[in-house]
């Protein structure tokens, strides 16, 4: 559980002091980039995982795809796992651009569709609402920076 710390209008700071290994989290917005910085306590030698649920307009349609090292390993509606990743592009035709995920240290990325269920006149429907991105890595001593950058075509 994160507690909010005094912040400025340019960033928000949080801390998790109620755990064995405190984590500090700083969120800032700079032009077209969202930065999230994690700072770990020195004694934390664990695996750190965080989850990003990102609504992409194309969702599981034909216009949404991952681009990794210049290749397309799959679409937003597919399961994806990549190791030693520091950058991946989420390219979306409906968005008319892309979201670039960058990390300061190599991570394991697990991506999968996030579905909801709704009831309509024809019964229950499973609808993809977002892309879930799980970022996992050993806690780096210098901390971890995750950046999401939105780019128009």
Question: What do the PLM-derived regions correspond to, one by one?
Answer:
Residues 46-56:
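Surface-exposed beta-strand/loop patches in extracellular or lumenal glycoproteins
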Residues 70-91:
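Surface-exposed, gly/pro-biased binding rims or lids
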Residues 9, 28-30, 59-63, 73-75:
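Residue-level detector of solvent-exposed, low-hydrophobicity positions
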Residues 54-68:
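Short aromatic-acidic-glycine turn motif
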Residues 1-43, 84-153:
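Beta-strand-rich recognition/accessory modules
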């Amino acid at each position: 559980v994160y507690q909010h710390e005094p912040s400025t209008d340019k960033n928000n700071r949080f801390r998790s002091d109620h755990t064995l290994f405190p984590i500090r989290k700083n969120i800032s917005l700079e032009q077209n980039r969202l930065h999230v910085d994690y700072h770990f306590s020195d004694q934390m030698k664990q695996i750190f995982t965080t989850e990003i649920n990102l609504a992409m307009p194309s969702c599981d349609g034909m216009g949404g795809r991952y681009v990794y090292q210049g290749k397309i390993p799959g679409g937003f509606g597919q399961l994806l796992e990549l190791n030693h990743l520091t950058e991946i592009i989420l390219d979306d035709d409906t968005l008319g651009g892309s979201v670039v995920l960058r990390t300061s240290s190599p991570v394991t990325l697990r991506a999968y569709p996030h579905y909801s269920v709704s009831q309509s006149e024809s019964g229950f429907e499973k609808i993809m609402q977002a892309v879930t991105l799980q970022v996992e890595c050993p806690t780096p001593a210098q901390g971890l920076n995750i950046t999401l950058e939105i780019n128009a075509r």
